[in-house]
């Protein structure tokens, strides 16, 4: 049994942690997203669970939503916001089970949600995660 007491952060505290983690990511990576809007919820909405055909709301830690590079740079630029959703309860469960730092988990979720959306390879995302 661990000697560490895990104190669950509030929604606001987790959002602050995500903003700090995002600010420490490489500038070139952050530039992919444009202005990022952060949403932290305890669980994903039912439509997200249904659209992604998830078995459980604990099956997803985060979700990126926004235009891709082609939509943002074409002749008819899409002006929809770039958003990242972080799901607090699944993140906290993962944190308690895996024993990784919460900061590391949040950074990992950010890098992978943004990276997958923009077509980065696993190797590229791993390099971004290691740059700090």
Indicate residue ranges for each PLM-predicted region.
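Active-site rim/adjacent substrate-binding subdomains
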Residues: 1-105, 117, 121-126, 132
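Catalytic glutamate of the conserved HExxH
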Residues: 109, 113-117
């Amino acid at each position: 049994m661990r000697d560490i007491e895990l104190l669950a952060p509030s929604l606001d505290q987790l959002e602050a942690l995500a903003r700090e983690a995002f600010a420490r990511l490489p500038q070139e990576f952050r530039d992919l997203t444009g202005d990022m809007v952060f949403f932290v919820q305890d669980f994903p909405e039912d439509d997200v669970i249904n659209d992604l055909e998830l078995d459980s709301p604990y099956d997803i830690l985060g979700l990126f939503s926004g235009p891709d590079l082609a939509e943002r740079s074409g002749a008819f630029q899409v002006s929809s916001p770039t958003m990242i959703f972080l799901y607090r309860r699944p993140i906290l469960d993962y944190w308690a089970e895996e024993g990784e730092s919460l900061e590391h988990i949040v950074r990992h979720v950010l890098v992978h949600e943004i990276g997958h959306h923009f077509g980065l390879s696993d190797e590229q995302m791993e390099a971004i995660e290691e740059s700090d």
